[in-house]
Swiss-Prot record:
Complex formation: Part of the 50S ribosomal subunit.
Protein family according to the UniProt entry: Belongs to the universal ribosomal protein uL16 family.
Alphabetical GO biological process terms: translation
SUPFAM superfamilies reported in the protein's UniProt record: Ribosomal protein L16p/L10e (SSF54686)
The organism's taxonomic lineage, starting at the top: Bacteria, Pseudomonadati, Pseudomonadota, Gammaproteobacteria, Moraxellales
InterPro entries, alphabetized: Ribosomal_uL16, Ribosomal_uL16_bact-type, Ribosomal_uL16_CS, Ribosomal_uL16_dom, Ribosomal_uL16_sf
Protein name as annotated: Large ribosomal subunit protein uL16
Known function: Binds 23S rRNA and is also seen to make contacts with the A and possibly P site tRNAs.
GO cellular component, one term: cytosolic large ribosomal subunit
UniProt entry keywords in alphabetical sequence: Ribonucleoprotein, Ribosomal protein, RNA-binding, rRNA-binding, tRNA-binding
Pfam family, one: Ribosomal_L16
PANTHER family, A to Z: 50S/60S RIBOSOMAL PROTEIN L16, LARGE RIBOSOMAL SUBUNIT PROTEIN UL16M
Amino acid sequence: MLQPKRTKFRKMHKGRNTGLAHRGSTVAFGQIGLKSLTRGRMTARQIEAARRTITRKIKRGGKIWIRVFPDKPITNKPLEVRMGKGKGPVEYWVCEIKPGKILYELEGISEELAREALTLAAAKLPFKTTIVKRTIM
């Protein structure tokens, strides 16, 4: 599963997920992509589950780009522990997703197969998505 090799600090504040995605909001590498419509968090497990789904559907054809990386640690205190005594240990890693962010990109397969693969992958994610094509400039 994806997680940073090393970080400056082990734990992070919760923060607020506001605004729209301006960076990473266009299909840059492939021909067709999966774009978020709502905001949320995408865990490393969800990124991997969606990637596996796409890989199984396209069967060794084409290329996949994963445009998100889980770089935010989420901590959790053990069950039945009283309040206080410090922040809990890191449980898993997430990526904060803003509306408009491209999550996955595909190339080298038919558009119909790509749409099917991305639709299956979208079912694994906790927010609404849409399929977008690359715009030629």
